[in-house]
Amino acid sequence: MMVYIMNAFDIKSTKMDVLSISLHTSDLFDLEDVLVKLGKKFQESGVVPFVLDVQEFDYPESLDLAALVSLFSRHGMQILGLKHSNERWAAAAMKYHLLFCLSHSENVKELGQVEVQKTEDGQKARKTVLITSPVRTGQQVYAEDGDLIVTGAVSQGAELIADGNIHIYAPMRGRALAGAKGDTSARIFIHSMQAELVSVAGIYRNFEQDLPNHLHKQPVQILLQDNRLVISAIGSE
């Protein structure tokens, strides 16, 4: 008899404090010399996780990623993912079982723009990150302390995160996590609802099956009511 365990685990949004290594050379011998000295500090602390920032390199072929990951690992520095502003690096990250992170500053410059609004007294209000290009599988976009607006399609396996609201004016097939810092008033607005997972302030729902016809591939809004996620068609009473 096969037994299924329900609620065996929960999926929640989280933020990890992970150090970033900005790589300036592809020379493994030069890196080895530095790591022999620096690595002792990390070896004493056990394995320390890092994201490898490869922004200074245009193409994955310019680096021996397998050797780099192995080199850092030998010195107590575990590479969890790659960071770059160009999506071509996502495939390289997947090849070596690494996460891929879009460089936030470069991502904003290449894909969209940031608008910082001001209140009447001149104080900075919530800023808005605008992404006009498609967000592809493996990419993550994070709007810190503000709202996120996306006008391009969001692929399955892509992730949108905002401390405020999320607006998606295109088909949404990935994950959307609003109110990432706990804002329970945050909302998610989707033009064509096909998401894998949605979350508001850590309360999530994943979708293993299509929603009812009045919601699937329709404009919807997602919000919290009484600590529960509510998904409703936009324009419905």
Swiss-Prot record:
The record's annotation in SUPFAM superfamilies points to: Cell-division inhibitor MinC, C-terminal domain (SSF63848)
Which BP terms in the Gene Ontology apply to this protein? cell morphogenesis; division septum assembly; regulation of cell division; regulation of cell septum assembly
The UniProt family comment states:
Belongs to the MinC family.
* Alphabetically ordered keywords of this record: Cell cycle, Cell division, Septation
Organism's domain of life?
A: Bacteria
Function recorded in the entry = Cell division inhibitor that blocks the formation of polar Z ring septums. Rapidly oscillates between the poles of the cell to destabilize FtsZ filaments that have formed before they mature into polar Z rings. Prevents FtsZ polymerization.
Q: What is this protein called?
A: Probable septum site-determining protein MinC
Note the subunit structure: Interacts with MinD and FtsZ.
Record's keyword annotation contains Oxidoreductase:
no
Q: Does the keyword section mention Aminoacyl-tRNA synthetase?
A: no
Q: Which PANTHER family match?
A: SEPTUM SITE-DETERMINING PROTEIN MINC
What Gene3D superfamilies does the annotation carry? 2.160.20.70, 3.30.70.260
